[in-house]
């Protein structure tokens, strides 16, 4: 019964969302990929919301319920039937009566299973599609026949791009660029490689003192974005990691596609705060610093996190707490082994959590990390 009711609710709010798009005709920026969607979506919103009335997907809500709700400007009612009824009534009022509606929607669009994005792409026609990263082993691969099938699914939104629309592509990700070879749309590429249209680089970790500490710890990162002969400095505080630069570069590319001045883009990004759980810096007790990357665990995210930990110059021990990387299917054991081997070269103490992460702990031990430097919890 619950499943039937959920399907009915999704059908109603999707129908309302379609009518809302038809009535108000907003422009749409869709963000797809396996890594960095939420960070990229938020950075894009920061750039364009200062110039256009803009609405974005909340948090990491990116499925067949969340997307219509974002279009309608309604909250997720979760398991409250009265709030769902209220949402459906408000959706009808949005369609029936004139409202002030956003000029731009920035939608994060995810796919856990085959057909998820293809279904959405049949009724959403974006003006801009951003493809972030796939990596060597994308998350959710467990539910797809092959990596190519997953890439095609997540990339299907690009095929729904409006005539005259723009693709924003991660130039450093070979799977992204190979997929885009078959597409004829206008494009702007971004990345660290010199061949990109928007080139990020010259990045370094900044250091400072936190309250109640006499020691210097990482405070953020600084980097530059080069585009069309201009070199723009960007400073990020409160978070760290190479992976944060990609969302900023993608947002810069979107701003460029929309005709926003590069100085205005950089000023907006200077005030941007990355989402929680993505390499956020949290001062701890007893002269410690916590790097909070707890939102999700994937091969790309763990690799980038360990690289960042490796590059930090700071007193004291470096400790990594690694959990299971889910939904990797046949790649699970090998990827957990890789993380253990990598961690053994970076940390003085490794803590693993989860059954799959037993493999991580064992690989770190085999790679030379001492037994008393590894703690394993199921």
Summary of predicted features, one role per range:
Residues 18-24, 49-152, 241, 245, ...:
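ATP-dependent carboxylate-amine ligase catalytic core
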Residues 26, 161-166, 183-186, 347-348, ...:
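A short helix->loop->beta-strand "cap" motif at the edges of active sites that frequently abuts
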Residues 127, 163-167, 315-316:
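Short glycine-dipeptide loop
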Residues 372-378:
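Short acidic-hydrophobic, aromatic-tinged amphipathic segments that line or gate anion-handling sites
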């Amino acid at each position: 019964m619950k499943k039937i009711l959920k399907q009915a609710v999704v059908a109603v709010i999707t129908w309302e969302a379609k009518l809302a798009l038809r009535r108000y005709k907003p422009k749409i920026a869709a963000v797809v990929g396996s890594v960095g969607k939420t960070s990229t979506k938020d950075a894009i919103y920061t750039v364009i919301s200062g110039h256009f009335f803009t609405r974005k997907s909340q948090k990491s809500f990116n499925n067949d319920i969340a997307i219509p709700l974002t279009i309608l400007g309604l909250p997720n009612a979760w398991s409250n039937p009265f709030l769902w009824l209220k949402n459906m009534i408000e959706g009808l009022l949005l369609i029936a009566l004139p409202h002030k509606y956003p000029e731009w929607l920035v939608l994060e669009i995810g796919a856990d299973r085959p057909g998820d994005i293809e279904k959405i792409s049949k009724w959403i026609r974006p003006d801009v599609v951003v493809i972030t990263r796939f990596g060597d082993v994308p998350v959710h691969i467990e539910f797809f026949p092959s990596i190519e099938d997953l890439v095609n699914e997540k990339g299907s939104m690009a095929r729904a791009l409006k005539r005259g629309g723009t693709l924003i592509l991660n130039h450093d990700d070979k799977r992204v660029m190979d997929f885009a070879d078959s597409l004829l749309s206008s494009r702007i590429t971004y990345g660290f490689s010199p061949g990109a249209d928007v080139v990020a680089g010259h990045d370094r970790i900044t250091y400072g003192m936190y309250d109640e500490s006499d020691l210097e710890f990482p405070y953020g990162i600084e980097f530059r974005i080069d585009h069309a002969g201009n070199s723009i400095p960007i400073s990020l505080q409160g978070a760290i990691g190479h992976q944060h630069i990609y969302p900023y570069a993608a947002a810069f590319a979107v701003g460029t596609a929309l005709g926003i001045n590069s100085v205005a883009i950089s000023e907006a990004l200077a005030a941007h705060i990355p989402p929680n759980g993505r390499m956020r810096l949290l001062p701890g007790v007893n002269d410690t610093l916590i790097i909070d990357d707890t939102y999700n665990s994937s091969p790309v995210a763990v690799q980038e996190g360990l690289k960042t930990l490796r590059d930090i110059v700071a007193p004291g021990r470096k400790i990594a707490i690694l959990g299971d990387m889910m939904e990797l299917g046949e790649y699970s054991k090998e990827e957990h082994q890789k993380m253990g081997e990598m961690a053994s070269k970076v940390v003085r103490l490794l803590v693993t959590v989860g059954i799959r992460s037993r493999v991580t702990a064992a690989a770190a031990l085999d790679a030379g990390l001492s037994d008393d430097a590894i703690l394993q919890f199921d």
